[in-house]
Design a protein with these regions (language model features):
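A beta-strand edge to alpha-helix "cap/lid" segment located at domain peripheries
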Residues: 2-15, 70-154
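Low-complexity proline/serine/threonine-rich segments in eukaryotic and viral proteins
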Residues: 1-2, 61
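Short, mixed-charge, low-aromatic patches
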Residues: 19-29, 53-55, 73-78, 130
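Exposed alpha-helical structural elements
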Residues: 20, 40, 64, 140, ...
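Short acidic-aromatic low-complexity motifs
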Residues: 11-47
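Hydrophobic alpha-helical core bundles mediating ligand binding, dimerization, or RNAP-core interactions
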Residues: 25-32, 45, 65, 69, ...
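A solvent-exposed, acidic/Ser-Thr-rich amphipathic alpha-helical stretch
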Residues: 38-92
Length: 154
């Protein structure tokens, strides 16, 4: 079994590195899917983390990232991430996932499934990421939010 230098003070096998990354991703998504941004962001994002999300300016730091997710989560009843695959490098994790959203006040509770790719700027042994970049097309979710809002309008 080969070993990779994945952190300045930690040498792990590829299998151990992937297991640690997978567990971190599961913990990250469980916390995020709770739709409670404060503990999620402060636990998994470094205080100076930069987040790039489609259609948004670069968000910097806990305050901006929490504010973004608070706005987004007000439109949701639920969010569930399913990891499809991931790859680890010494300083980042690449992940493919499907995110299933249910829009708040949708009488049908129809899940909106959106595939996406994310890059997490963290090394093995690091608990918080320094950057988070998301690639996905949120337009099906935005369309559903608009249609539910229009149906509720007097």
């Amino acid at each position: 079994m080969s070993t990779l230098k994945s952190h300045p003070t930690t040498t792990l096998s590829s299998e151990m590195k992937d297991t640690a990354a997978h567990q971190w991703l599961l913990n990250f998504h469980t916390a995020g899917d709770s739709l409670n941004p404060e503990p999620w962001v402060t636990t998994f994002f470094s205080p100076d983390c930069e987040m790039r999300f489609p259609g948004q300016p670069i968000l910097k730091g806990h305050r901006e990232i929490i504010a973004f997710f608070k706005r987004q989560f007000t439109n949701l009843d639920s969010m569930k991430h399913t990891i499809r695959r991931f790859d680890t490098l010494p300083d980042r994790i690449y992940q493919e996932a499907t995110i299933s959203y249910v829009v708040r006040a949708d009488p049908e509770k129809e899940p909106i499934d959106i595939p996406g790719i994310a890059i997490f700027g963290k090394g093995v042994g690091e608990e918080r990421m320094s950057f988070f970049t998301v690639y996905l097309d949120p337009s099906p979710l935005h369309t559903k939010i608009r249609s539910v809002s229009a149906a509720l309008a007097p």
